[in-house]
Design a protein with these regions (language model features):
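Solvent-exposed, acidic/flexible segments
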Residues: 36, 40-47, 124, 128-136, ...
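Zinc-dependent metallopeptidase catalytic helix centered on the HExxH motif
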Residues: 103-181
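Sec-exported extracytoplasmic/periplasmic mature domains
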Residues: 52-59, 141-145, 163-171, 231-236, ...
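Pan-zinc metallopeptidase signature
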Residues: 3, 193-298
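Fold-level signature of zinc-dependent metallopeptidase catalytic domains
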Residues: 12-46
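N-terminal low-structure segments adjacent to metalloprotease catalytic domains
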Residues: 1-21, 291-298
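Auxiliary, metal-adjacent structural segments of Zn-dependent hydrolase domains
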Residues: 36-121, 125-129
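Surface-exposed patches in mature extracellular/periplasmic domains of secreted proteins
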Residues: 54-72, 145, 150-155, 174-177, ...
Length: 298
């Protein structure tokens, strides 16, 4: 049954603004006036700087492409509708954003969809570490979309791993480290449990602390520990740097686009020469990652 794509219709009628050679913005004619007045410049400059942080990881785009980051700005009054924000997390929120389908051929497969007041009202100086990590999380999803779409469990794990582990934000994120320090193995989900939560729509419905970012939900923490554990395994097994290990992992993901089930995990297990059951049903990888985090605190 055909379902109308309202965001696509909005983008069709939008105006285009070129912020620089790597960021372009689409927005309504009313919001374009604010863009032209410089209202969004500080926010976009911060996004540019955050993309430069991810550049340090030297992620190799397929075919050496240089996709554009598109930012789709929508009005506050219907952002949940246009961006299809999950009601579980955004029922009473007045602003928000998330990666959405990119309709521009020179962009990443995903664009960054944002309500207008995210650009207008967010603090641009002295950004809290939680907010910085959260923005890098969303941008990581967009970069990752070149390699993987559709597997929430792995995607969320990578989107957490890039800023927290690879960019070392975890070392400065005191509240997050405090939460990690309290976790035991029975608090962490296995990959099988995470895949089941993805299927039944309960992934992320398990906050450790109220009113915090997704990093403080057990599903996301479990996915993070899994992907971090995979990277540490690759680094150790093949004597690779973290940036080299990222590209190795992405090469595995790129060869398995579209899987969202156990077979995807089996392919990862085969590539890393790990038993299927160990990766899917046990928590050895997550436990080792958890222990490596705790060692940093000693």
């Amino acid at each position: 049954m055909y379902q109308e794509d309202y965001l696509r219709n909005y983008i069709k009628e939008s105006e285009l603004r070129v912020f620089n050679d790597r960021i372009k913005v689409r927005l309504s004619s009313e919001l374009a006036i604010k863009y032209d007045l410089g209202v969004y410049t500080n926010f976009l400059t911060r996004i540019e700087n955050e993309m430069k942080m991810l550049d340090k990881l030297k992620i190799k785009s397929p075919a050496n492409a240089k996709p554009i980051l598109y930012i789709y700005v929508v009005p506050d009054d219907n952002f949940t509708f246009l961006l299809q924000m999950p009601t579980l997390f955004f029922k009473d929120k007045k602003s928000g954003g998330k990666p959405v389908t990119c309709y521009d051929l020179d962009g990443f497969p995903l664009a960054y969809g944002l309500s207008q007041n995210c650009l207008e009202n967010k603090e641009t100086d002295n950004l809290e570490i939680a907010d910085l990590e959260n923005e890098l999380h969303e941008l990581s999803h967009i970069v990752l979309s070149q390699f993987l779409l559709g597997n929430q469990v792995i995607s969320e794990g990578i989107a957490e791993t890039l800023p927290l582990y690879c960019l070392r934000l975890e070392e400065k994120f005191e509240k997050y480290k405090q939460v990690i320090a309290t976790l035991e193995e029975n608090n962490i989900y296995s990959l099988k449990e995470l895949l089941n939560k993805q299927r039944d729509g309960s992934y992320g419905n398990d906050a450790v602390l109220p009113n915090m970012t997704c990093s403080f939900r057990l599903s996301y923490i479990s996915s993070y520990l899994f992907v971090r554990g995979l990277l540490e395994r690759v680094e150790e097994k093949y004597l690779l740097s973290t940036t080299e290990a990222i590209n190795y992992l992405f090469s595995i993901l790129r060869g398995n686009r579209g899987y969202a089930n156990e077979f995807f995990i089996y392919d990862i297990a085969d590539a890393l020469e790990l038993p299927h059951d160990e990766l899917l049903n046990k928590k050895d990888i997550q436990r080792k990652a958890l222990n490596s985090i705790r060692r940093l605190e000693m």
